Swiss-Prot record:
Gene name of the record: CAR5
Domain spans labelled C2: 22-142
PANTHER family: PROTEIN C2-DOMAIN ABA-RELATED 4 (PTHR45933), PROTEIN C2-DOMAIN ABA-RELATED 5 (PTHR45933:SF14)
Compartments (UniProt record): Cell membrane; Nucleus
Descriptive protein name: Protein C2-DOMAIN ABA-RELATED 5
Top-level taxonomy: Eukaryota, Viridiplantae, Streptophyta, Embryophyta, Tracheophyta
Protein species of origin: Arabidopsis thaliana
Gene Ontology terms: cellular component: nucleus; plasma membrane
Pfam family membership, one: C2
Subunit structure: Binds to PYR/PYL/RCAR abscisic acid intracellular receptors in an ABA-independent manner, both at the plasma membrane and in the nucleus.
A GO term for molecular function: GTPase activator activity
Transmembrane segments: none
GO biological process terms held by the UniProt record: abscisic acid-activated signaling pathway; positive regulation of abscisic acid-activated signaling pathway; positive regulation of GTPase activity
Sequence positions that bind Ca(2+) 1: R57, D58, D109, D111, D117
């Protein structure tokens, strides 16, 4: 087998044999290096519902929008003008590879000519929601409470949060009290999206 390989390789120019060798090495490296898709568990869809009693940053109102960050990912909603009780009802979808990471939500006031004003932030973990997903529940009556998360120093929940089985899927409604600001809350909902070949 070795003799045969050497014989056939001698039929090709040296430069072509080098190209094949380099291509083979690159292919080997690509197989050995884990990609983002390999570590991906699924997608977290965060529906930013609305803001309640947000801080005033302009003359009599604010132009708020929400920025959501997790690890190196950053997404934002549209701006709603002149409203301290805005309704976004907008979905922001993050890829999740580590369920221990927290999500940072920050509200800003949009300004045309100056730097956008910060209107508070809140942080929350997704571990309780992920743990409920790992139960692999099926065929529960819609509205069944699977688990609850209490407000504590470790989260920014304004009230008890429930993970609920709703229309064939798990969702978690959360009300976040904003920090580093005089007032304001943001209501959101978490939902998990499975990917083909992936899972918890």
């Amino acid at each position: 087998m070795i003799v045969s390989f050497l014989y056939f390789s001698s039929l090709f120019p040296t430069s072509l044999r080098k190209i094949n060798l380099v291509a083979g090495e690159k292919h080997k490296d690509r197989r050995m290096k884990p990609s983002l898709m390999d570590s991906l568990l699924g997608l977290l869809r965060i529906r930013i519902k609305r803001g309640v009693n947000l801080a005033v940053r302009d003359l009599n109102s604010s132009d708020p929008y929400v920025v959501v960050k997790m690890a190196k990912q950053k997404l934002k909603t549209r701006v709603i003008y002149k409203n301290v009780n805005p309704e976004w009802n907008e979905d922001l979808t993050l890829s999740v590879s580590d369920p221990n990471l927290t999500v940072l939500l920050t509200v800003y006031d949009y300004d045309t000519f100056t730097k956008d004003d910060k209107m508070g932030d809140a942080e929350f973990g997704i571990k309780p929601f992920v743990n409920a997903l790992k139960m692999h529940l099926h065929d529960l009556p819609s509205g069944t409470i699977v688990t609850t998360v209490q407000p504590s120093r470790d989260n920014c929940l304004a009230e008890e949060s429930r993970v609920i089985w709703s229309d064939g899927k798990l969702v978690q409604d959360i009300v976040l009290r904003l920090r580093h600001v005089e007032c304001g809350e943001v209501e959101a909902q978490l939902q998990w999206i499975d990917l083909p070949g992936k899972g918890l």
